[in-house]
Amino acid sequence: MISYPFFSLSPPGLVPPPMAVPPVEMYSGSFWNRMRKPLPLRTQVIRFTVVFVIVSFILAVALQITHERMPDPKVTKPLPDLGFELLTKVPGMYVLADCCIGFLNILSVFTAFKLYLLHRHCVGSGEPELPCNIPGVSRFFLSVWLCKENCRIELRNIHTIAWIRFITSYALLLLFRSAVIVMTSLPAPDDLCQDPPKIENPVKNVILTVLTAGGGSIHCGDLMYSGHTVILTLHLMFHWIYGAMVHWSFRPVVTVVAIFGYYCIVASRFHYTDDVLVAIYLTIATFIAVGHNADGAPWQLQLFIRWWPCCGANSREVTEDSQPVMVAFKSEELDEMNGVLEGRQKKHGGVGDGESLMFKCGAYV
């Protein structure tokens, strides 16, 4: 019989982070310990996506209020701005900023799909197959891309965790923006809002704002801080962390596109320079604060969705999001622990759930 030291064996190619499957004892006991128990990742994806939709409606209402409160451009002139003085005004550049966002949206979806393929490869599911094999196309879209130099994160469930981090950061930033744009009304810069149109149907305008992400609705005065800059920077951070794991070129490409988008926003005079700078700082700080965690969003954010009676289960199945692990013991150590267990049974009339779980996972080797 071969003897091994006490250790954990994982499936080939999988290296789980420490405490990937928290023990039962960690979340038993006090109320706050139970509140810190992570929700299933699938539940977080669904509920935080619903939260994002709700926040989008809140922002749409805030944009409506801001439009009505905006100072009259005929009376209040634009504020002095160093960016306006250094950059020549190019009215059509705002369209290019939208194009930059559209390009990054597509690239982020592609990256998220590649992260999903990495997850499948990690758990041993292999590459998916198309109904009809198209030479070159199938290999490009369905092959696993991995830049090992930038891969320092556990790949299991990485696509789900990345989406949770992205959507929660975006929701927090939009919710804070809803408050900021209403609190202080700044004079419109030298853009199309110098002659703001009247909103005839507020409800329709709110719905259009949500459905078109602001592109098909009327809103002026939402200056501090820039929503376009938020999404540009959020894509930048997403690819700086996760895109670089797929391909090394994503970092420089997205950085150039984001910087060009910032330039377009200021050069078109749709935002003051401070609107852009504050949005960049807040987005980077929020994305870092939310962080990447095997449990998904920080437990403080999960408190806002923990009480929901719908949209997913509130208890985590061990096999859903966790790393399957087999624990091996030396035979003499297992005999000794079984003796301790029998002694506790005679003395206390039973054992705890955690002890039972541990010995069920034990194996002779």
Swiss-Prot record:
Record has Lipid metabolism as a keyword: yes
Q: Where are the transmembrane segments?
A: 45-65, 93-113, 166-186, 230-250, 252-272, 276-296
Q: What happens when the gene is disrupted?
A: Elevated ceramide levels and growth arrest; cells were arrested in division but replication of DNA and organelles continued giving rise to cells containing multiple nuclei, kinetoplasts and flagella.
List of catalytic residues: 228, 271, 275
* Biological function: Bifunctional sphingomyelin (SM)/ethanolamine phosphorylceramide (EPC) synthase with minimal inositol phosphorylceramide (IPC) synthase activity. Specificity is likely to be defined by residues in the lumenal catalytic domain that interact with the polar head groups of the phospholipid donors.
Q: What membrane topology was assigned to this protein in its record? A: Multi-pass membrane protein
Which UniProt keyword terms apply here? Golgi apparatus, Kinase, Lipid metabolism, Membrane, Sphingolipid metabolism, Transferase, Transmembrane, Transmembrane helix
Q: Which GO terms describe its molecular function?
A: ceramide cholinephosphotransferase activity; kinase activity; sphingomyelin synthase activity
Give the species. Answer: Trypanosoma brucei brucei
Query: Which principal EC class is assigned to this enzyme?
Result: transferase
Primary location class: Golgi
What protein name is recorded for this chain? Phosphatidylcholine:ceramide cholinephosphotransferase 4
Query: What's a GO biological-process term for it?
Result: ceramide biosynthetic process
